[in-house]
Structure formats: structure tokens, C-alpha cells
Amino acid sequence: MKFFYSFFCSLFACLCFCFPSLMSANEVNLQNVFANRLKSPNHKISVINENNVFSLCYKKTKAIELSFNNFNGTSQNAQFVFLRKLNENYRMKTGKRAVCMNEANEYKAQISDNLAVVLRIYNDGIAFRYEYNHLSNGIVPQETTAFKILEGMKRWMQQWADSYEGFFPISDTYKQTPVPSYSGTSKSKDGWNNRWGFPALVQADENVFALITEANIERRQSAACLFNEGEIFRVVPDKNEKAGNGPWHSPWRVVILGTLADVVESTLVTDVCEPAKIQNTDWIQPGVVSWVYWAYNHGSNDINIIKRYVDMAVRLKLPYVLIDAEWDQMKDGFSVEDAVRYANDNHIKPMIWYNSSVGWVDGAPTPKFKLNKPEDREKEFAWCEKIGVAGVKIDFFSGDNQMNMDYCIDLMEDAAKHHLFVNFHGATVPRGWQRTYPNLMSTEGVYGAEWYNNVPTFTKKAAAHNATLPFTRNVIGPMDYTPCAFSDSQHPHITSKAHELALTVLFESALQHLADRPESFYQQPVEVQQFLGYLPAAWDDTKLINGYPGQFVTIARKSDDKWFVAGINGTDNPMDIKLDLKKIVKGKKTVKLFLDNPDNNEQWLFKTVELKELPAVMNCVPRGGFLLVIS
């Protein structure tokens, strides 16, 4: 263990808070440690070794502490050596950017004959993983990677639940009461929650933030979460039952670092992932989806309700419809094949729902046990392809253990053989699979609009929560929040209409499910209906214009020659949001504005202006929003 102590205390210092001097408390004296400095290609991020502690710094600002120790092995002093420079571009079918740049300096520390640590320093963060030449008896050595998040530092962290459907409340302390409804919560001897899910956002300084997560889960690996003891937050992988023998490496531990724009715009989670394993991806087409479940929880066993949602997709010019749970119990002598045929006859591509049958089984919706065995899965996916199903939504998993991770990979790979999209629900958050398996279009792992069906809690929390997600959950991958609730479900919403419409751009998901019922969309002005018909679900570029978690956010996304700019007010008070678009768009452009009517929240305001006439400030009503289309 001693070898790890020396090295990991070293790595701890480089990613740790830089030490005080005559400068401000959050600045580091780079002169004293320059000789031990590892850096990013643009030199903005540095990993600094001082006294066997590693510190992660953005420019001159200390960010967050990181420590590694207590691994099985012998002790020796380890030093990082430069290995190579990564500089490549890769394309994504989905996500915040079509062409991503994978640029980093890679370093390696050989800890023993059996173990090395690979560290990559990117322009927007760092990533590291452990690489073993062989495992002993198939046992993965215990990992105790730990981050130090000081009391008083602002943080937005989600208490762990196996569905990752929780809030990211702002706090400056780890002392938070466990949420009793979460499955898998844990508490310390003092009674505070001590288990946290990825991602975790921490504010290190006024303009410096760090987002902690992980990426590139492969077979023989489990996903991880954070357990804390006071200020120390340890990375703890879930059960890893069958790691096998031979070479093994951990997933990448990732820290995205910089300004809020650096965090929101980062593709670091997919940068470290394996390239696409699907060669022909022409059949993978992101799009907007009409969705039965939000308004009719048991509506997918009624062909007449399904037909209404197909007709809605036709009228709004949406490419997809989702037939949700219980389609195998279709009423009145009909079958799901009848529903699928109706959709395809109307040139709408249908997707259907499955229970994963590894999580909620007893009393859970059907169909169940169709996908667990390879031979059953092959039969089911072949049948889906034959009858004209475009994709599958698979629900109710049971945590982050290796069994679930392997199962998810099996599902993505086998679905791709039959040209089926995949959308995971009741599952873990994205960890970069969308690059390796481009048919993974979206993942739930979010407290979304579905919760208007379940509890009254969401009504008052939704606006602030919506203004937090772009800085936390949606940074790491697609998010099937299911926006656009213009009407009410079991519990009311108090966000404005423009707020709800803005979410369709603000939240990135390659399958953008629209929550509301057909009649609600038909009641909206023609401008809104037409917009939904040309709304993209994947983007060429993404830029954060401004914002702060939980308060407000404005994001611009590009598709072809259009920019879509969405902003929301997460507070209960009116807010003026500055709108400076000079860095993203210039010249003679036309702007369509979708706005709230400040005199009547039930009405819209629409304007079309030249770009040069665009107001410098958007006046938002409480929990309001706005949307611009620039062409």
C-alpha cells in the first residue's frame, strides 16, 4: 500500500486546492511549483505536485482536492512522465456538438509492475484511470479515490438513488438530511446523507467551477458514486462480480474544470470514451416524439389513444411516436402490431417500451422478461425490426453494479444489430456510451416532467430545478426530461408557457419527448405548432450565453444555419436577462421571438425582428422564459 500512498498523495496535491501565499486565498504561487507542473495544451489547466500532494488549478485559481491511497500493492515513489499528445476530431450523431475535439496531454505513472495510472489533462478538465496488467483471482483492488470539498464551498449535488431522479439543491455544506423516498440512500453516524450520485458541481471561486463524474463504463466494470466522511468524498464503485482475470482498467474519473461556459459546453465525458462500434449510422436519426404516458399513464393499451398521438405527430410534423408500457395488454382485440402498422402507414416511426426485468418486477408494468436472455433478446429485437419498430425504451434497472452495466451494453449492441434506437429509463446517468453506441439516443436519470404525475413537490421546485440541470445533469449526456407541459397532469405546473417551450432547446436529448396531450398542443398558436415541427434534437454546436445554477440560464444551440437561443428564469420574481449574442452570430439575420405575455400568462407574444433590433435585455416573468430562432 505504501507505493500508492506516495503516488496518490502526489496526485492528490496536483488536483488539490493550491496553497495560500501573499496572493488571495484561492490563488496558487506557480513560481514555487513550476518544475512539478503538468499542464493542458492551452496551459489554462495545471496539475501541480507539491509535497506529494497534487492540485488541480484553473489559471491561478485553486479548484478541488483529490487524493488516492489504500490500494493493494507495494510502495514506491511514482512520477508522471509525458506519454503523448492527443489531437483528434470525432463526429457525434447526437449531443451538444456534431464535431468534437479530443485534445489533451497524456501522462503516465508506473506504480508497480502490475499497475499504472494514466492522466490526461484537457483544455476543459482532467481524466485519469487505473490500468492493471492482470487481476488476481478476478478481484478488482479496492479504490479509495477521494475529493476534498471544503465546508463553505457552494455545491450542487444529488443524493444517490438508483434511478438518479433527484434534485441538485444548492448548499455550502455536506450536512444534508437524507431524502427518505430515495432508493439506496445512506447516512453517516451523525445522521447526514453520505451517498451522492454523479455528477457533482462545485464552485471553487467566483468564476471557477469543477464538475466531478466518470466516463467510459465497459464490460467487467461497475459504475461508481461518492461516499463522504465530512469534507472527504470517496469514489466508491458498485459491486463488480465478474471482473475476470487478465488486463483490467477502471473507468475514467473525470473533472471538468473552468468557467460555467467551460462546464456546460464540455464534451469531456465522450472525449475519453471508445469510438463508435457501429459503422453504418445512417439509420440513426434524432427527432421529436409524441408520448402517450404523461397524460395517459395506462394509455398504451388503448389503440384509440395511440392513434391520437400518431395523428398528433402527423399534424405537428414530428418523426416519432412512443408506445409506452402495457402495449402487450391491448384492449378490444387489438395488438401492438396494429398500432405499429397505423403509425408506419402514416409515416410516423414508432418506438415501444420494455421492462428490463432486473429492477422493479413484482407488480410492475409489462412486458417483462423479454430481453434478459440473449436468445430471447435476439428474438424480440428481430420481431421489432420485422414489424417496423424504430426503437425501444427500456425501463426499471436496479443500480450501478457490473451486472446492470453489462446488461445495458448487451442491450445497446443487440439492438443495433436490428437497427433499433435505445432509450434507458429508471437507469443510471450517461457516462459516454452515446459515443461508443450511437444508437443510445437518450437516458432518463433525471427528475423530469413525469413527476407532475407522482407528487406535488415538483410544482414549486420545477423552475429552479430546470435552471440547475443545464449545469449539472445535462452536462454529461442526453437527458430525457420530457418537456413542454403546457397543461396540467395530476399536479399543476406554475412555469410559464414560454418557459416550457424553451426547455425543448435548453435540454439536450436526441429523442425529445413532448409531455403534453394532443389537444393541448392543438390549442397553442400556429407559431408554436410550426416550431415543434422543425425543432432539432441534435446540435452542431452549443454555447452558454449566461446563467447561474438555480437562478437563470440562457443557452444557444446551432443546427445547420440556424441558432436556437433558449432562456429561463428559475426564480419566483421577475428578471431581466441580458442577451449578448455578438460572439455567436453576426450580419443580417432575422430573429423570431417566442415570449410570455407579461399581462396574461395564458397568452403568448410573438415578434419577428432584424438581429440588429434585438433587445439587449429579455424581460422574464416569474418562472418565465423565452425562445429565439435566428436565421
Where are these regions (language model features)?
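Carbohydrate-binding surface patches
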Residues: 548-585, 626-629
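Catalytic cores of secreted or luminal carbohydrate-active enzymes
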Residues: 498-544
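An acidic-aromatic substrate-binding cleft motif
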Residues: 245-320
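N-terminal accessory beta-strand-rich subdomains and adjacent acidic, glycine-rich linkers
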Residues: 28-269, 600-602
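Bacterial Sec-dependent N-terminal signal peptides
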Residues: 1-33
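C-terminal beta-strand-rich structural cap/linker in extracellular carbohydrate-active enzymes
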Residues: 608-631
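Aromatic- and carboxylate-enriched substrate-binding clefts and catalytic-loop regions
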Residues: 326-496
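Edge strands and adjacent loops of beta-rich recognition modules
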Residues: 95-101, 531-555
